[in-house]
Amino acid sequence: MLSSPFRHSLCGVCWAIAALVMGGWLAGGVPQATAQEPLDPTKQVRDSADQLKIGGKDWGQWLGSPYRNNVVVAEKIPLEWDVTTGKNVRWSVKLGSETYGNPVVANGKVYVGTNNGAGYVPRFPNNVDLGALICFDAESGNFLWQHCNEKLPTGRVHDWPDQGICSVPMIDGDRLWYVSSRGEVVCLDSEGFLDDENDGPFTGEPNGNKDEADVVWKLDMMKELKVSQHNMCSCSVTCAGELLFVITSNGVDEGHVNLPADASPSFLCMDRNSGKVLWTDSSPGANVLHGQWSSPAYGVLGGVEQAIFGGGDGWLYSFSARGKDGKAELLWKFDCNPKKSRYALRGATRNHVVGTPVIYDGLVYVAVGEDPEHLEGEGHLWCIDPTKRGDVSPTLVFNAADPNKPIAPKRLQACVETEGDFERDNTNSAAVWHYGGEDIEENELAMHRAVGSVAIKNNLLFIADQSGVFHCLDAKTGKPHWAYHMESESWASPLIVNDLVYIGDSDGEIAIFRCSAEMEKLSEVYMESACFTSPIVANDTLYIANRNRLYALQEGAQAKVEEEDGESPR
């Protein structure tokens, strides 16, 4: 966490000067922004929802759609609320003791991943550690059912204690898909056993209790694909029709040096109805740096269906969504790190992709990051043209032994000058612009590593980095407009609702800004404990999960205040 005792903000004029110093650049030959009306990203979300059997104002997957742009239009969304008095709170409910899974809302239900600290299921009291996916009624907040994932016997190398479910489910009709803490891709019946049916083909649940989940099918990636996730299996899936896209979380061993399963898949495409694996890819291979905890995006770009995955090697990969002849078909790949950057357990300058790639107006946006426990570090945010093919990185690495042939990627450092390596500009580069790099100005406002993703509206891009700096840039050029220091780490992705931007931090504060090229902070609300998740809006209700509680917020609401064990109002 940064030790700065003050909050920073810089005007657009200062940032325009600082951009060159901080590493911002715009690739030559790329069409510049015009005076035409900016894309309406909320229409993309609505169009995506129209393809699913969910309500038109539901929020049925991570970041709302396969485009992964957390932008929405809504009414009655408050600027202020008070979780201690219940002002503008419709309801709140207990979660586990640690919550890293984001809430989603579909067809009258709210789903959120956490641990078992709330103890909703009698056969697993709250002193039993589980990965828990919990389903609540969206209107009342009443508990409906929980999918209970017992801890893996291998322990923290695969299933870190108390972390619970870190992924976010996707819902379509009466089906739900998510990645469990046990390394399983799971399809559930969204009704659970409340419909008095045990949906199959899987019918081996331990019981048919109405407070537990009804599993339709599941794929054990550790058993069937020999995947070895590092610490936690975390991927928030997305779909294109009947295709389900998954990142496996395959990573290093407990010593953080070796990869136990470097030939196992990193990326999957599955039939979401049957659980059949349609194609796999293991491109990151032995070059995975740590874990693989990003989530896929999907879009039709340049007339081609593309499934886009952030790799644990720091590369972004795009594949033909449907594959070819039962195999993965790579369209392009992009190294998101400078070639001379180096990976180390502490103080690395090379990073992998943790946040989710975002698609906006035909371009792809992604930032690099790292497990927050591995300290802070410099970051890089990229805008990429997805219509090019092959290796579309900004530069290529060669070696003096064969100076005309690019060398293969290397794990810890791509370009080692002492070994005769050198760089050349890539004439096939798809980089539109880059933002970040070393903090030469030493004002702590450079782009740091990021766990979250960007949100974009009206060509204004917002992203919070792990060090707690909230950045606003021009989405077309990468020009910085302003930055604000939140004085606390942030793992969250911003939410843009109407002309407001919401972002949370690990101190438990939600800051609200005007969606503007001029920095205007409107409000800051304390949530009583850390907010590692991202705010969402569904059906004119703002949902925020802090470390141990889920809140449904709406202008004019008043939750009943109860004094039970010091709990917040509900």
Stretches found by the model and what they are:
Residues M1-C11:
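N-terminal secretory signal peptides that target proteins for export/translocation
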Residues G12-G28:
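Bacterial N-terminal signal peptides
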Residues Q32-R570:
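Noncatalytic, solvent-exposed loop/strand surfaces
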Residues P5, G28-G29, A33:
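Intrinsic low-complexity/disordered segments
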